[in-house]
Amino acid sequence: MKRIVATGTFDILHPGHIYYLEESRKLGDELHVIIARDENVRHKPKPVIPEQQRLRMVQSLKPVDYARLGSTTDIFEPIREIQPDIITLGFNQFFNEEKLKCDLEENGISAEVVRIEGYSGEGFCSSRNIMKQILIRRCKELQDDSTD
């Protein structure tokens, strides 16, 4: 059985997330998803949606066999427990792949690292762009309301 691990914050689910998980699932028999903990998200603004809700949403997605929250102290802990054959990275996850491979080896994890290409479909494919559009549209509505 080939186990795949996908990781991410998954704040404000969108078609790009679904594509990443579907493509990850195609690489093996079981897809395990590790959701970033609220307190560990440092590379971008804190998530809007709390970690337990993000976990519940990801658990309900068709390509996902298992989902769990990551560790607050050791990012490799759940990966050691799962023992995946492949770890997938999204196109916009800014990991140095060579460093990640070395870190995995140092932690006794012998998984292949595969980067999933970006989603090229229509619609919103970025949580940041979704939030930006919400702000633009709501600000315009508020401005229109204030001129009435």
Swiss-Prot record:
EC number: 2.7.7.2
Annotated GO MF terms: ATP binding; FMN adenylyltransferase activity
Residues binding ATP, per UniProt: T9, F10, H14, P15, G16, H17, N92, Y119
Pathway: Cofactor biosynthesis; FAD biosynthesis; FAD from FMN: step 1/1
The protein's enzyme class: transferase
Reactions the enzyme catalyzes: FMN + ATP + H(+) = FAD + diphosphate
Record carries keyword GTP-binding: no
Cofactors, names only: a divalent metal cation
Alphabetical keyword list: ATP-binding, FAD, Flavoprotein, FMN, Nucleotide-binding, Nucleotidyltransferase, Transferase
GO biological process annotation, one example: FMN metabolic process
Pfam family, one: CTP_transf_like
UniProt xrefs under PANTHER family: FAD SYNTHASE
Family of the protein in this entry: Belongs to the archaeal FAD synthase family.
Primary role: Catalyzes the transfer of the AMP portion of ATP to flavin mononucleotide (FMN) to produce flavin adenine dinucleotide (FAD) coenzyme.
Description of how the protein assembles with itself and partners: Homodimer.
Listed name of the protein: FAD synthase
